[in-house]
């Protein structure tokens, strides 16, 4: 079996759910604005049904739909919809933990069938969430003070997915050390690019996280992060370093599809792992299936 731990899909724009993210959307629709990433090779409305069809062609059994911020970033309607509608899809949503009703929002969305956790876009300015990346922002440290929210997340078994840029890993370390009972997933292995070699500072920070058994690292976004063509050989020693530090039980493959569709096929987002010569078949089975299910309690 194979689970894609990081995929995206989204519904059409409407009055209730307008497309508003200027970095993603475009066209003349009444509810859309900005410049769509025309490089995508998938349909502009890439629904759960289309994702499932692509999964079937790749023989991916299940996928985690990470909320796609094409609408206002806290609008989780479509992620919840597909998680409730399809047994093969689960969902990760985004909530403003600083909102007055944040706990109520969390309790409501976690009650939906198939929702397994929340995502923090710690690499984005809070007022430009998912519209711009900025390695200098530090609102994650302010989020530490939202104690009631994180207590609710722990009570609800909400896995906390954190997307961050390498210079912000010290914030992630402080956050995790403050709330050691939560379950954590580090998206895109903290966006470490292929030209950064193991031993550099980002890897030292990740090594600190490896000491926490409740932290899993996603081996996702590799097509974007690599400076080379398939099979992305500059990322191979990153895989081996993660394997050594975290063990295969805490590394999980994710495609970041269809964000990668401008440079790779869905198949290539997975099969590059077969070219990491030192990985055993058992390692691959853990990384592409067992590790994530075990980590978030899906097994």
Q: Where does each model-flagged region fall?
A:
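Short, electropositive alpha-helical surface patch
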Residues: 78-87, 176-185, 238-244, 267-276
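Catalytic pocket-lining loop regions of alpha/beta-barrel enzymes
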Residues: 136-252
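Hydrophobic faces of well-ordered beta-strands that scaffold small-molecule active sites
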Residues: 3-7, 63-66, 90-93, 116-120, ...
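Active-site gating/metal-coordination segments in enzymes
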Residues: 70-167, 174, 218-222
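Acidic-and-aromatic substrate-binding clefts and catalytic sites of carbohydrate-active enzymes
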Residues: 42-45, 67-74, 95-103, 128, ...
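Divalent metal-dependent hydrolysis catalytic cores, especially in the metallo-beta-lactamase
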Residues: 29-44, 49-71, 88-94, 116-123, ...
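Mid-to-C-terminal alpha-helical segments outside catalytic/metal-binding sites
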Residues: 1-5, 14-57, 62, 240-241, ...
């Amino acid at each position: 079996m194979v689970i894609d731990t990081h995929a995206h899909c989204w519904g059409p724009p409407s009055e209730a759910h307008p497309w508003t993210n200027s970095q993603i959307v475009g066209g003349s629709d009444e509810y859309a604005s900005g410049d769509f990433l025309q490089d995508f090779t998938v349909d502009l409305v890439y629904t759960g049904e289309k994702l499932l069809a692509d999964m079937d062609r790749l023989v991916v059994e299940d996928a985690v739909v990470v909320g796609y911020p094409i609408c206002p970033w806290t609008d989780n309607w479509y992620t919840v919809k597909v998680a409730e509608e399809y047994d093969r899809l689960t969902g990760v949503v985004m909530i403003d933990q600083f909102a007055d009703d944040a706990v109520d929002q969390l309790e409501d969305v976690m009650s939906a069938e198939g929702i397994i956790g929340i995502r923090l876009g710690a690499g984005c300015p809070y007022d430009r969430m998912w519209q711009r990346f900025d390695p200098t922002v530090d609102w994650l440290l302010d989020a530490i003070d939202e104690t009631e929210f994180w207590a609710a997340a722990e009570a609800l078994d909400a896995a906390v997915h954190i997307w961050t840029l390498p210079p912000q890993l010290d914030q992630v370390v402080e956050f995790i050390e403050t709330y050691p009972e939560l379950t954590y997933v580090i998206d895109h292995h903290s966006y470490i690019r292929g030209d950064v070699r193991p031993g550099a500072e980002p890897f030292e920070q990740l090594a600190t996280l490896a000491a926490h058994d409740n932290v899993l690292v996603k081996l996702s976004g590799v097509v974007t992060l690599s400076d080379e063509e398939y099979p992305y050989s500059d990322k191979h020693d990153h895989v081996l370093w993660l394997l050594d530090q975290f063990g295969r039980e805490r590394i999980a493959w994710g495609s970041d599809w269809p964000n990668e569709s401008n440079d790779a096929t869905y198949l290539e987002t997975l099969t590059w792992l077969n070219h990491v010569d030192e990985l055993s078949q058992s390692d691959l089975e853990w990384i592409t299936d067992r590790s994530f299910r075990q980590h978030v309690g899906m097994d």
